[in-house]
Amino acid sequence: MSEVSEAEKRRILREKRKQKFSKGAGSARLHKITTQQPGGASGDSTVTSAEISDNEGSLQRGSNSGQSTREIDDLLAAMDPPIEPAEPLESAAPEVAFIQQLMKMQQGSATPPADEKAGGLFSPLLERLAEQEAGGAPVVSGEVGVHQFQVRQLKAYMLLLRWAILLPFIYYVMHPGTAHWLHTSRFLHFVMEPRNFFMVFTTFEVASISIYYQVLLTLERTNKVNSLSYSSKLVTWAGLVPDGMLPIDNLQGKVVVALHYWDILSMYLTDLSLCLVAAGLMKYYHAAP
């Protein structure tokens, strides 16, 4: 029973020492414990010199290891470059903010994608978006600026030329009796017949738009600039799609062709609508007393 009680006492003392050391008592607490003798304790319950030396050695090793750990942390902090503050998303463009959110979602995802092929397809797209974001908005050079000015000038000249012909044509179609000289020629009489209006108008539009596009292609070859590459975002975004992601070859080229056809159709529909409005106004004011 005496051995059991001595073992229990040693265990209790050891636990007390550990608690005091964990609370930061340090060597002062150890010195206080070793120098004082409890009044009610027997001689066998005192701490031996071997245990004291072991405890002091462990404390010294712990303090040395803590100091070395702090030195390593200081070295790593000195070696790491300073982190620049990230630019807030509010100051960036909406497209750039969306791209940054996509990149963060891809980098912060801890679970791997279920389909690795899909991830492989989207990775080139995100890389190209990141390259565009890093490069910023394309800088319009002097040659591109001159080309865009020439294209706008060409559109203005063609618009004036078309309506310089269309307005008299609409007037004489709506009022064929005002010009008797038109009946001297069978060709002019055929052109000015109201029932032939849409056929003549469509033929004129096809000819004028063809001339416009021929001159536009000549300007693009001379200046070596594609007009849609700098004026349409659809062409820019189609160029970012990597090959093989969609079952369409040369997606950017097909988008350019589709935009050309849409431009032709929009020009035709715009002129037709304005012609109908002009015809209605001429008929109304000519019929008024």
Swiss-Prot record:
Region of interest called Disordered, as start-end residue ranges on this chain: 1-68
GO molecular function, one term: membrane insertase activity
Biased composition (Basic and acidic residues): 1-10
Gene Ontology BP, a term: retrograde vesicle-mediated transport, Golgi to endoplasmic reticulum
Role played: Required for the post-translational delivery of tail-anchored (TA) proteins to the endoplasmic reticulum. Together with GET1, acts as a membrane receptor for soluble GET3, which recognizes and selectively binds the transmembrane domain of TA proteins in the cytosol. The GET complex cooperates with the HDEL receptor ERD2 to mediate the ATP-dependent retrieval of resident ER proteins that contain a C-terminal H-D-E-L retention signal from the Golgi to the ER.
Comp. bias intervals (Polar residues): 33-68
Localization (cell): Endoplasmic reticulum membrane; Golgi apparatus membrane
Protein name: Golgi to ER traffic protein 2
Entries under Pfam families matching the protein: GET2
PANTHER family in UniProt: GOLGI TO ER TRAFFIC PROTEIN 2
Biased composition range(s): Basic residues: 11-21
Lumenal compartment residues: 174-196, 285-289
Subunit and interaction comment: Component of the Golgi to ER traffic (GET) complex, which is composed of GET1, GET2 and GET3. Within the complex, GET1 and GET2 form a heterotetramer which is stabilized by phosphatidylinositol binding and which binds to the GET3 homodimer.
Cytoplasmic side: 1-153, 217-263
Keywords, ordered alphabetically: Endoplasmic reticulum, ER-Golgi transport, Golgi apparatus, Membrane, Transmembrane, Transmembrane helix, Transport
Residue stretches spanning the membrane: 154-173, 197-216, 264-284
Family: Belongs to the GET2 family.
Cross-referenced InterPro entries: GET2, Get2/sif1
Topology in membrane: Multi-pass membrane protein
Any single GO CC term annotated in Swiss-Prot or TrEMBL for this entry: Golgi membrane
